């Protein structure tokens, strides 16, 4: 009896000794972790000048050495109703939720894949066709190779798919037109390759739409339910969801985006196109019309605090507190530079050369990685300096500069605030 008790105590002690307890975020002043507060404060006035010049809003959070050292909001979550400036615009707060756009690729799809890889439920060298039946070359395809595509090819954006087939716009998509999720998967299978796989690099939303379907195939769960129940909820995240208006959130909690739906101020038309100011619905057309708001490439909403926790998971090597999602080897595997393009890991953008200066600035370490989102979002994670930055914005919440010349350039997109690197450099430049 005594031997059993002693053995039990020793076993319990041994297990607790090996239990992983990851750092959790706490609040600290900038000076406590090596910043010059006066230099960092200059950023405040510069961002406010951009808001005064017409940039809708910016939410910024900075992490250094496991501490949140700066969290602030500037501007307006909603200042327009259509083309009309509101008499009483809604100010952005540090709790405002934003449409992450392509940062969804990292903090929903990549996080899910990293977890599944760590658990041994998927290998990045697996064929896509293993998880998506019927994923193969079509009889009329000029470029062959779909049946040999691997998940790693999709993650590296070298699979051969076009950047944006515009499935919901029948005028552009033609026979690939789809405004339902079940049809969209079939249209993806039929989407012809534009180049021989692994011969060049084209960043493609289709790649991450495919990855979303693969995750659903493995987990037997919708993508949103999987990440919300197995990643976000265990981490204690309360403002990171797909389709927020269907999950208890209200428009005033969320930053608005395009003024006239997806029409780019009236120059784009297709069946069922939204024309009202987008407020709480994902902006991305493929995510909304073709995927019901939940896609591997876009659709996630979050705030800066929740994003800080997710970035800290990466800095920690895969966990937070007593929760382990994946390990440091998985983080290294996914953030390692691609042989085809040094600015890509497995999905993650990497600070691999000077072409990334507009994103990561000139002062971040070459090991820095993260992603951007079309709506005005940036995440930057620097493992060398143990530092991370998240910028959330609603750049499309302004008029289109010249709809007939380029419907994708908004007035706010012409301001310096539309480029993230200068903000990143000002933060790094404030280090002592």
UniProtKB/Swiss-Prot annotation:
Q: Name one GO cellular component term.
A: plasma membrane
Can you say where in the cell this protein is located? Cell inner membrane
- Asked whether the UniProt record includes DNA damage among its keywords, one would answer no
SUPFAM superfamilies, per this entry? beta-lactamase/transpeptidase-like
Catalysis: reaction(s): Preferential cleavage: (Ac)2-L-Lys-D-Ala-|-D-Ala. Also transpeptidation of peptidyl-alanyl moieties that are N-acyl substituents of D-alanine
Keywords (alphabetical) are: Carboxypeptidase, Cell inner membrane, Cell membrane, Hydrolase, Membrane, Protease, Transmembrane, Transmembrane helix
Topology within the bilayer:
Single-pass membrane protein
- Report TM segments: 7-25
Enzyme Commission number(s): 3.4.16.4
GO MF terms, alphabetically ordered = serine-type D-Ala-D-Ala carboxypeptidase activity
Which ranges form a coiled coil?
A: none
Q: Which family does it belong to?
A: Belongs to the peptidase S12 family. YfeW subfamily.
Q: What is this protein called?
A: Putative D-alanyl-D-alanine carboxypeptidase
Q: Which organism is it from?
A: Salmonella gallinarum (strain 287/91 / NCTC 13346)
User: Which gene produces this protein?
Assistant: yfeW
């Amino acid at each position: 009896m005594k031997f059993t008790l002693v053995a039990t105590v020793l076993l319990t002690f041994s297990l607790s000794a090996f239990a992983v307890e990851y750092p959790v975020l706490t609040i600290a002043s900038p000076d406590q972790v090596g910043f010059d507060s006066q230099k960092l404060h200059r950023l405040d006035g510069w961002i406010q000048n951009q808001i005064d010049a017409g940039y809708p809003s910016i939410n910024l959070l900075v992490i250094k050495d496991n501490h949140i050292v700066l969290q602030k909001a500037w501007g307006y979550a909603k200042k327009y109703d259509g083309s009309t400036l509101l008499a009483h615009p809604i100010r952005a707060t540090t709790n405002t939720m934003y449409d992450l756009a392509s940062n969804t690729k990292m903090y929903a799809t990549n996080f899910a894949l990293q977890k599944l890889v760590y658990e041994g439920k998927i290998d990045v060298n697996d064929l896509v066709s293993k998880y998506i039946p019927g994923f193969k070359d079509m009889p009329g395809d000029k470029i062959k190779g779909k049946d040999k595509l691997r998940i790693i090819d999709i993650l590296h954006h070298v699979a051969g798919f076009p950047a944006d087939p515009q499935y919901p716009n029948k005028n552009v998509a033609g026979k690939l037109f789809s405004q339902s999720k079940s049809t969209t998967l079939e249209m993806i299978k039929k989407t012809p390759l534009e180049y021989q796989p692994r011969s060049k690099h084209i960043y493609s939303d289709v790649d991450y739409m495919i990855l979303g379907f693969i995750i659903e195939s493995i987990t037997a769960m919708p993508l949103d339910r999987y990440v919300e129940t197995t990643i976000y909820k265990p981490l204690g995240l309360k403002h990171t969801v797909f389709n927020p208006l269907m999950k208890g959130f209200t428009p005033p909690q969320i930053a608005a985006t395009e003024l006239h739906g997806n029409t780019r101020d009236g120059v784009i038309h297709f069946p069922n196109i939204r024309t009202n100011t987008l407020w709480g619905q994902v902006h991305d057309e493929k995510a909304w019309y073709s995927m019901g708001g939940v896609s591997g490439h876009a659709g996630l909403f979050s705030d800066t605090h929740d994003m800080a926790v997710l970035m800290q998971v990466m800095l920690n090597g895969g966990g937070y507190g007593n929760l382990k999602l994946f390990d440091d080897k998985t983080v290294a595997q996914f953030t390692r530079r691609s042989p085809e393009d040094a600015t890509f890991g497995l999905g993650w953008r990497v600070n691999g050369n000077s072409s990334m200066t507009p994103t990561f600035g000139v002062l971040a370490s070459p090991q820095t990685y993260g992603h951007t989102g079309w709506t005005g979002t940036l995440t930057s994670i620097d493992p060398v300096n143990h530092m991370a930055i998240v910028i959330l914005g609603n750049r499309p919440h302004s008029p289109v500069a010249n709809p007939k010349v380029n419907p994708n350039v908004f007035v706010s997109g012409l301001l310096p605030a539309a480029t993230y690197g200068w903000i990143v450099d000002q933060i790094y430049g404030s280090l002592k």
